[in-house]
Each structure stands twice: as C-alpha cells, then as structure tokens.
C-alpha cells in the first residue's frame, strides 16, 4: 500500500507536512516526499494506492473509554457493531469498559472478551474492574488480570465511595504499572442523575446532579493519586472546578490524567431542553463556564485525553421520561469531527494538538505500541478531509442515541487503515 499526496500529521514527532507512506506487511516501511511504484524497489505494480490529496493522514485514533455492552447488553451494542462504529470514526484501537454482565472482574470473562475482540478488524483492548461486581468492596486479582491481558482497571459507571478501598486499589495498580480510571460522582449529592443541578433541572422540576458531586471525589482522588504514585485517570471530566483541582495536583507531582468527551467540550446543559434524553449522560452536561474551563484544560494540557465514553442505548430506553431513561450517548462516529469543529476550527487547538490527545497520549498511558506514524511502526491511520462538512444521520453502531444527529460538522473520515488493511472507506 502507498498513501500519496496527503499531509502526514504525527503528534509524537511533530511532523506535519506533505509526505507519502509506503506500507508493507502491516508496517510503515518508508515515509518520503514522493514514493512511486516505479521508483521504489520495495513496491510492486500491484500496490494499493490511496490518493490522500486534500486530506490529513494521522495515526489511527485510540479511544480509552468505550462501552460495547458485550456480554450482557447486546441489544444496545456488541463487539462487532462497536468495532464497525469505531472504524467508521477513524478509530483503530479502543479500550472497553468492564461494566458488562458478567462484569469483567475475572480472568475467564476477560479472556473471552479479548478472544472475540481479536476476530474484529480493529484492535480491542479490555479494562478489568477494580472491584468484584463493581460493588466497591472486594479487591479483584489485579496481577492475574494483568497477566491475562487487561490493560487497566476501572469500575466506570459506578464511583468508588470508600476512600481507603480506592487508595489500596491505586497502590496495587501502581505496583503493576497499570492505569486506574475513576468515575467521579458521589451519589450522596445526587437526586436525579444525568442532568446538571441548575437552571435546566429547575425548569424540568427535578433536582439533578450538582457539580460538587464530581468535584468532591476528584479532590479526594487527586490527593490519593499523589500519595499512591499511580497513573490515575479522571474520567469524562465535566466541571471547571474539577479541571482546576487536577491542574493543581499535577503541579504537585501527581501522575494524573484527565479525559474530556466531545459532548462536554461542545454542549452545555441547555442541550437537554432541545434534545431531551439524547443529551442525558453521567456526568451531565454543565454550564458554559464549565465548558470553557474544559477547553482551557485541553489547551494547557491539564486534560491530556479525548475519549468518547461511547454509551449505546436502545431507542425504547431513551424514549422514557427524562428521570427514567438511562444516561449515555454514542460517540465513536462523531468524535474526530467534533474535535475539529469545536476545537481546531475555533482556534483552541492545532490539528496536531487535537490528534495528540486522541493517539499518542492514550497509547503511552496504556503502553500500546501504536499512536505514531514512523518507519517500523504499525500501519494504523485515519485519513480525513479536515474541511468537508457533513451531517450525521446514519450510524454503524447498533444504537443511535446522540444529540449530534442533524448537526453540521466539519471534518470527515475518508479511510481508516489498521495493520495495513483498509477497514473503512467513505464510499
């Protein structure tokens, strides 16, 4: 395969210029200004050629936070449809969460998921639970789960309310050099999850979920991260104060990482009034001031990861009243475009800075040999037109629960390549 005429964007090296890429046996073998079948002895006349003129060629995107709902909830999504959605969105690697049924808290369930994931065209990693059955009480065997292939640990979807248990889990993860990711919402503060406590919840006649519910646990866990030395990920950060807390503890030396989702840096709580349950998620969309602080955190590097929290639900579930419908939206197929639309086109981040948070940063955190375009590296690419406008309307995901349907976005994935194979083409 030869990818020609595109701008190669590699955040790991800072490369951002017109280059061709020669791929052989799933690896990048040459990056040069002009590679042709005739001039390069390693190429043959049968080479597949992708003309990337007018496009950017970036490393295959990596999402550290997806829910494929498999096993147990496959009416919402499964490993196959989730992988198709990932490929359509430019993602070649994903990290699946552990809140399935059964929970990924044991070696057998972990190995089953990983075995089925290997049948797909993307690279599927699996995080294991921190606690048995996500109850926040009993330790899992982290060492055995790491040995069996877990890439990290998380009880995502449910917060760890016991500080001593959380601290012990961080210490154990640190010994194994494994990241531990935390869902930060203290249920003691929350009456109605998924909607911010504020003007919108008041208009709906409900109490909602105040930002202090997140901030209190973020403050606690940033301190525990500092003391434990663990790589701690604050998942789907939604509060501006939470961003400030993370920044403060990073300066103190804590090995803290933070995820921002495209919905939290694009939308505010007002979206609930327009889109109803399609804009309901945990943690909820908050105020414009919170959104601006999340963007500031992305700009200064406090937030080093952009992750989707891809959370499919059925149309029947999302059609329930706002207090009864489940929280969460799909995100794999719109993530890159939302980053371009909300961050790059508005001048907040450069294209390399956006891609850094979606490729090399997650790869380094999870010790993945991906996320870069360099000779000898895996031939994983997202090839996209940064200026093409489009409107999301049909999805490869089994579900379609998103407020972004019908919204004009800029930046369209044209090809996704994983291991030297085209796994998605916009044709």
Set out the residue ranges of the language-model regions.
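N-terminal metal-binding scaffold of metallo-dependent hydrolase/deaminase domains
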Residues: 1-43
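Divalent metal-coordination and catalytic microenvironments
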Residues: 6, 21, 26, 54, ...
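Active-site metal-binding motif and surrounding structural segment of the metallo-beta-lactamase
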Residues: 36-57
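Metal-associated gating/positioning segment near the N- to mid-region
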Residues: 53-117
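A glycine-rich helix N-cap at a beta->alpha junction
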Residues: 115-130
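Histidine/acidic residue-rich metal-binding segments in metalloenzymes
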Residues: 137-306
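His/Asp/Glu-enriched, well-ordered alpha-helical/loop segment
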Residues: 203-231, 278, 297-300, 304-306, ...
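C-terminal cap of metal-dependent C-N hydrolases
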Residues: 321-324, 378-427
